Regions:
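Rossmann-like dinucleotide-binding cores of NAD(P)H-dependent redox enzymes
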Residues: 59, 152-153, 160-218, 298-304, ...
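Mid-to-C-terminal Rossmann-like scaffold of FAD/NAD(P)H-dependent oxidoreductases
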Residues: 1-2, 8, 284-397, 428-432, ...
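Beta1-alpha1 glycine-rich phosphate/pyrophosphate-binding loop at the start
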Residues: 1-79, 117, 166-189, 328, ...
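Short hydrophobic core segments
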Residues: 103-113, 156, 234-244, 308, ...
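A Rossmann-like FAD-binding core segment of flavoenzymes
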Residues: 25-27, 69, 75-96, 103, ...
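FAD-site-proximal beta/loop scaffold in flavoenzymes
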Residues: 125-149, 232-313, 405, 409, ...
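Glycine-rich dinucleotide-binding loop and its adjacent helix/turn
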Residues: 110-172, 207, 267-269, 489-499
């Protein structure tokens, strides 16, 4: 069997290695248009910031190591420019010489990835404007920063890579402004959870311009102007365009393969395209949302690696299947961590799901052990079935651990109240005897058994309009003074028993 793989990095490289482990006799050829066949693109911002000092650490495999370890032929700086399905061949262009040749295949795996979105606007040709997707992009940005020593940078977009780059530039002493068309950063989070991230960036000196659209760029002597709708242009020494990515599916489209959401390549659960001899994996493919069943894009390294493995398995006769993505994600925001899995409220509403949400802010470990800090957990579950729909956590230490527990619970089909019964590891430096995940389960259980009723901030307008309703804030005096909602009276919880007479027994209390 001869297998040609178009693209390396996560999906293609994983497929190649898995194929070799399953079939020693297969002929495996990888064509990669960049100069690096397998690299840690999630680590690119940290190389720019100097956190990762040795760029070789970002290179996971080289053509030489692929050949020596796996007997796989890898050709970098080679781009597949056409697929000829009728004769099962691809046209390959050597990007260094311009020469073209054909390579036949028995099976073809497409892993072209995604491209940074570059909308039609003026100034995209400026040498002071960058995107970040490849090692070459990284080297270009780092070289610019080291040589030009920019004092200001404007970053358009509020996604993972862009925010990680913003943090690293800020840590290098660059004054950073983030321009985001939406009213929040990090769309996997709901706005209430993203507000913690906004506050952290602002506390670190990063300027946020939300609900602001970039309309173009203009290079001037020694600077680049970022033009925004309804405002004065922003002057900086460099700008980064990070407004998202789109699936690089042009090769598949020209070959007549079926496409799906946003032009992504349509695949089945075995990662087969509409041509049974062609598979596709990674950021270019359409995947099923494991919670809602809807089809869309998930541009994350974890799913891409798993898809590469599944495609290789199926090629070799194994019944592996990809059952959808929970899109579990995590990001470092200076000393803070934000993470999400499953769907958020916006997606739940779009899917027409009837859901309940709970929000809690426990400490990451035992309160008496030094260094404890609060994390905020937001959990969504379906009202009727009680299945967990999604979760978001923002905090400091221990956020990543808790989001992984919740992602596992979702995939295992656990119901929200069952989180109360999870037997999780405990020692004072790491957790509490009642772990934050258990506490989320306790709250869900109390709600569903009728022991507790809850209301949310968005319910306040309605509650205030009702006659005879008392609004009670049981936080400490200091917490109340630091900020409270209008219309609430403050009776600290520890004083409540002694002050019950201040409440009207004939009025509902919220």
């Amino acid at each position: 069997m001869k297998v040609v793989i178009v693209g390396g990095v996560a999906g293609g490289a994983s497929a190649a290695a898995r194929l070799r482990r399953l079939d020693e006799s297969a002929q495996i050829i990888v064509f990669e248009r960049s100069g690096y066949v397998s690299y840690a693109n999630c680590g690119l911002p940290y190389y720019i910031g100097g956190i990762i000092e040795n760029r070789d650490l970002l290179t996971l495999q080289t053509p030489k190591s692929f050949k020596s370890r796996f007997n796989i032929d890898v050709h970098v700086h080679h781009e597949v420019v056409a697929i000829h399905r009728d004769r099962k061949a691809v046209t390959v262009r050597n990007l260094e010489t311009g020469a073209e040749f054909e390579e036949t295949y028995d099976k073809l795996i497409l892993s072209p990835g995604a491209r940074p979105i570059r909308p039609p606007m003026p100034g995209l040709e400026s040498k002071r404007l960058f995107t970040l997707r490849t090692v070459e992009d990284t080297l270009q940005i780092r070289d610019f920063v080291e040589k030009e020593k920019p004092r200001h940078a404007v970053l358009a977009g509020g996604g993972f890579i862009g925010l990680e780059l913003a943090e690293n530039l800020c840590e290098m002493g660059v004054e950073v402004t983030i321009v985001q068309m939406l009213d929040q950063l990090l769309t996997p989070l709901d706005k209430d959870m993203a507000s913690f991230v906004h506050a952290r960036f602002r506390a670190k000196g990063v300027h946020l311009m939300l609900k602001t659209a970039v309309s173009g760029f203009e290079e001037r002597e020694g600077c680049i102007l970022t033009h925004v709708d309804g405002g004065e242009p922003l002057c900086s020494e460099m700008a980064i365009l990070a407004i998202g990515v789109s699936p690089d599916s042009s090769l598949a489209r020209e070959a007549g393969l079926a496409l799906g959401a946003r032009g992504a390549i349509s695949v089945d659960e075995h990662m087969r395209t509409s041509d049974p001899d062609i598979y596709a994996v990674g950021d270019a493919v359409q995947v099923r949302n494991a919670v809602t069943g809807s089809l869309g894009l998930v541009s994350l390294a974890g799913p891409a690696n798993k898809q590469g493995r599944i495609a290789a398995d199926h090629l070799c006769g194994l019944d592996s299947a990809y059952h959808g993505a929970y899109a579990s994600s995590v990001i470092k925001v200076f000393d803070m961590t934000a993470a999400a899995t499953g769907i958020n409220e916006h997606a739940a509403k779009e899917a027409g799901l009837s859901y309940e949400k709970i929000v809690l802010s426990p400490e990451n470990h035992a309160s008496y052990y030094p260094g404890g800090r609060a994390m905020t957990i937001k959990l969504l579950y379906e009202k009727e079935s009680l299945r967990i729909l999604g979760a978001q956590i923002v905090g400091f230490d221990g956020v990543d651990k808790r989001i992984d527990v919740l992602a596992t619970a979702m995939q295992a089909g656990m119901k929200a109240p069952e989180l109360a019964c999870l037997d999780l590891a405990y020692a004072p430096p790491y957790s509490s005897a009642k772990d934050p995940i258990n506490m989320a389960g306790f709250i869900a259980e109390n709600i569903e058994t009728g022991k507790v009723k809850q209301f949310h901030y968005e319910d306040l307008a309605d509650l205030r309009s009702r006659p005879g309703v008392m609004l009670l804030d049981t936080r400490t005096v200091g917490e109340y003074a630091a900020g409270h909602a209008e219309g609430f009276i403050n009776i600290p919880l520890d004083s409540l028993r002694d002050r019950l007479a201040e409440l009207d027994a004939h009025q509902p209390v919220y």
